[in-house]
A protein has these predicted regions:
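Non-transmembrane "mature" sequence context
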Residues: 2-169
């Protein structure tokens, strides 16, 4: 483990070890996929985990939320539920054009799982269907319905990583 990786919070280290090396990909490819999911390098100019962490801490642009929501066919109610942002606060964030660090962290979690699903399943369309459909590995719940908490996101990630490694069920 590199010194830079060791200095990161545990969740980022786990994400780096598991997600960035799915199918043998180097870390920079995983970051590029996640940046694309969050709206692209113009919105999220990060090339490293550290840069991405700093952007999340500063608050991601509201346009990143729009990119994730449209990219994964999320309606307003799903965004409010998954990100735990009241509708009035969401409207204020849209006017301010920036999310809080806490909201950004939840959006990062959603984007990370979405990017992982796209990577594992091979396309955004397949990831979209999978995220919205009931899943036996999640007790019949749709993966998106689990992403409002870290524990739920970890369960969804475990299911995706099992799929990536050919373990079904």
């Amino acid at each position: 483990m590199t010194a830079a990786l060791a200095a990161l919070p545990a969740a980022y280290a786990i994400w780096h070890n598991e997600y960035c090396h799915v199918a043998g990909r180097p870390a920079v490819s995983g970051i590029a996929d996640l940046v694309r999911t969050l709206g692209g390098p113009r919105l999220v100019p990060a090339r490293t985990v550290e840069e991405l962490r700093d952007l999340v801490r500063a608050g991601l642009p509201y346009a990143s939320l729009s990119a994730v929501a449209s990219g994964f066919s999320l309606d307003g109610a799903e965004v409010v539920s998954i990100l735990r942002i009241p509708a009035r606060t969401l409207a204020r964030r849209k006017r301010e054009r920036r999310l809080s660090p806490e909201e950004s962290d939840r959006l990062f979690r959603l984007g990370r799982i979405g990017a992982l699903a796209e990577d594992v399943l091979g396309s955004r369309e397949k990831a979209n269907r999978w995220l919205h459909a009931a899943n036996r590995g999640l007790g019949g719940a749709a993966p998106l319905s689990q992403l409002d908490t870290d524990l739920g996101a970890e369960r969804v990630e475990e299911v995706l990583l099992r799929l990536a490694h050919g373990v079904v069920g």
